[in-house]
């Protein structure tokens, strides 16, 4: 089940400040801690890293050029003379000083912030390497444009020597470019993988803190966050991969724009200005369309997750569905979820087709523009043939850079939807119970005390629509055994939830031992995905020898389990291989191993026969544990001293066991 609240809010999603703030909140912690004014420091560090990479790229270019000239003087003089002259001119200018100062400042600031950066040194190093490789790839593209300019001029002049020399240069560039581009792609994927691991663990830390996983349960009618499992598994992966891909593409576009615009401007100023206007038009149209695409993509992510959840729900309840012969209704419900997702995807296809129509026309028309403008210059003899071909290459590169948003608006819209889903999820985990707290003004006060007592306790449902128990006062002495009875829906299980701190909506006081001294046993015990050993020691990570585990199993009449399932360290789907009665007995084995001061049981023996029930309660009595049971069976009276009866009108009565027997006789 998913909430209807969040999809309505999705219609307001835009490329706005909220989207930017959510992006920073998710992206920043991997590289720099969140905090007041720290975002400015983080963005400043990114800018400084970029400047430092530019400085490193400059010195590498100087070293390779001058070193190459020293080793191959004839080659560099004949074929790379303009490059050598350009480098020599730069060395005589202010550029070397600026590059050196930038590196010194970067090193100083990194030293000053070493406390926050040292544990993040790997990610900053990988990001710096990525930026440097991006500069290198862009430089390779610029070099190739010049090589083909000279190759085409040699062809036009019928100069075979120059042609073969520059073709040899091109081959050398390709030999160097292939491993560089491969390393660039590998580094990008590696950083995305490390980032995904860290960010997923970061979300999991928040998800399991403050019982967020319980408050944000998709089965709860009070949640505003649908399918948190998808947000942690899929949206985080998409965020890290797409963030790096898109931001590096933006950087590449900026570098391409700077590099090839300079080339294009020297060929034709009119071509350059016209290109800028054309790209601005395309970007504006793409942004307008992208606003609608954000909502559609957001809804699609949610609806696909709903469909998947429906299938998982069928798998988890297959036996119950089979007993009820509910296949037809289940298929109908799953089919309805599929139909809703298909309808939204159909709308997505329509918008994608409209955008494709614009993008195709936009891209195909641009192919003739450089020819229309540069051809007259070539026919008039104002430019050579190589320049003509270079103009076409430069025009295409600049247009691609300027049209990044236009050509990738569908991916950007999907990315924005993912940011909003993760951002809303992240914000809710700061206070997962906030929506419930807004609906009421009072909370149950819980304090740690040696024994359990309730004082004027009133328990409401989380949505405050119903009062379950009102003004309940009860003292449970160390020798007491309390049985809670009442009609279905009158609040028996809810009372245990309030004692456990899961439900806080209400009034009054609860005094109880520390939660680690209490063990709660639900009617359907939780079977984790693990070994038999892990099942027995759950929820604690305690070391117990096999003999102790075997003894605990024998006490609850499950002594055959280790031999039946290959020992204590094999993994099985325990929910499937054990009956509910066996699961309940295994839960009592956990009680024996953990030795809690209080055992709180919610119909914990409902699937057991009378004999096994007697064995388990006698075991609890031998442990001298205080226990509270919720149940309906008259046989439970034998093991309890007091009975708390809850009534549908939120009233209650406390009886001794004998008085309650007489009442129901």
Predicted ranges, named:
Residues 132, 176, 180-182, 248-290, ...:
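A hydrophobic transmembrane-helix motif
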Residues 1-170, 184, 188, 214-242, ...:
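Membrane-integrated ABC transporters
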Residues 303-307, 322-326, 332, 369-370, ...:
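Cytosolic ends of transmembrane helices, especially the final helix of ABC transmembrane type-1 domains
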């Amino acid at each position: 089940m998913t909430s209807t609240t969040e999809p309505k809010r999705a219609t307001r999603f835009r490329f706005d400040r909220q989207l930017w703030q959510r992006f920073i909140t998710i992206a920043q912690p991997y590289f720099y801690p969140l905090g007041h004014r720290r975002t400015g420091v983080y963005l400043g560090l990114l800018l400084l890293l970029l400047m430092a990479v530019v400085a490193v790229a400059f010195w590498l270019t100087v070293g390779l050029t001058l070193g190459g000239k020293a080793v191959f003087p004839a080659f560099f003089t004949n074929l790379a003379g303009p490059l050598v002259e350009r480098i020599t001119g730069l060395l005589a200018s202010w550029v070397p000083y600026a590059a050196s100062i930038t590196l010194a400042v970067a090193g100083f600031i990194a030293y000053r912030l070493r406390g926050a950066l040292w544990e993040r040194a790997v990610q900053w190093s990988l990001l710096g390497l990525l930026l440097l490789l991006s500069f290198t790839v862009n430089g390779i593209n610029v070099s190739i444009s010049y090589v083909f300019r000279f190759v085409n001029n040699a062809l036009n002049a019928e100069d075979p020597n120059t042609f073969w020399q520059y073709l040899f240069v091109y081959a050398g560039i390709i030999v160097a470019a292939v491993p560089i581009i491969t390393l660039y792609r590998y580094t990008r994927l590696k950083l995305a993988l490390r980032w995904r691991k860290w960010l997923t663990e970061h979300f999991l830390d928040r998800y399991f803190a403050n019982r967020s996983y319980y408050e944000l349960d998709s089965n709860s009618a009070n949640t505003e966050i649908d399918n948190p499992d998808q947000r942690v598994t899929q949206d985080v992966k998409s965020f890290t991969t797409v963030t790096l891909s898109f931001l590096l593409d933006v950087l590449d576009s900026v570098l391409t724009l700077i590099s090839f615009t300079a080339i294009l401007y020297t060929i034709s100023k009119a071509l350059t200005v016209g290109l800028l206007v054309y790209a601005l038009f395309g970007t504006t149209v793409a942004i307008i369309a992208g606003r609608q695409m954000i909502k559609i993509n957001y809804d699609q992510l949610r609806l696909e997750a709903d469909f998947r959840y429906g299938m998982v729900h069928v798998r988890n309840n297959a036996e119950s569905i089979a007993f009820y012969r509910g296949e037809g209704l289940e298929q109908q419900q799953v089919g309805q979820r599929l139909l809703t997702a298909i309808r939204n995807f159909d709308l997505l296809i329509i918008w994608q087709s409209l955008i494709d129509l614009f993008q195709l026309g936009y891209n195909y028309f641009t192919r003739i523009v450089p020819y229309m403008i540069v051809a007259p210059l070539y026919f008039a003899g104002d430019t050579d043939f190589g320049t003509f071909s270079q103009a076409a290459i430069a025009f295409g590169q600049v247009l691609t850079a300027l049209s990044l948003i236009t050509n990738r608006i569908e991916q950007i819209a999907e990315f924005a939807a993912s940011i909003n889903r993760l951002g809303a999820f992240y914000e809710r985990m700061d206070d997962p119970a906030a929506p419930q707290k807004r609906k009421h003004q009072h909370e149950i006060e819980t304090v740690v005390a040696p024994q359990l007592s309730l004082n004027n306790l009133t328990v409401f449902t989380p949505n405050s629509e119903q009062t379950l128990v009102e003004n309940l006062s009860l003292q449970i002495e160390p020798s007491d055994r309390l049985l809670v009875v009442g009609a279905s829906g009158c609040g028996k299980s809810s009372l245990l939830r309030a004692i456990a701190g899961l439900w806080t909506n209400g009034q009054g006081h609860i005094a109880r031992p520390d939660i680690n001294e209490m063990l709660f046993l639900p009617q359907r015990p939780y079977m984790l995905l693990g070994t038999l050993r892990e099942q027995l020691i759950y929820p604690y990570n305690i070391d117990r020898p096999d003999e102790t585990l075997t003894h605990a199993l024998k006490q609850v009449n499950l002594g055959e389990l280790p031999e039946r399932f290959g020992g204590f360290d094999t993994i099985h789907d325990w929910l499937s291989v054990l009956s509910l009665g066996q699961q309940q007995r295994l839960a009592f084995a956990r009680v024996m191993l953990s030795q809690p001061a209080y055992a709180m049981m919610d119909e914990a023996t409902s699937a057991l026969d009378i004999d096994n029930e007697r064995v388990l309660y006698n075991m609890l009595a031998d442990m001298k544990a205080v226990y509270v049971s919720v149940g309906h069976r008259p046989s439970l009276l034998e093991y309890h001293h007091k009975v708390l009866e809850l009534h549908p009108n939120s009233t209650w009565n406390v009886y001794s066991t004998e008085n309650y027997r007489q009442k129901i006789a």
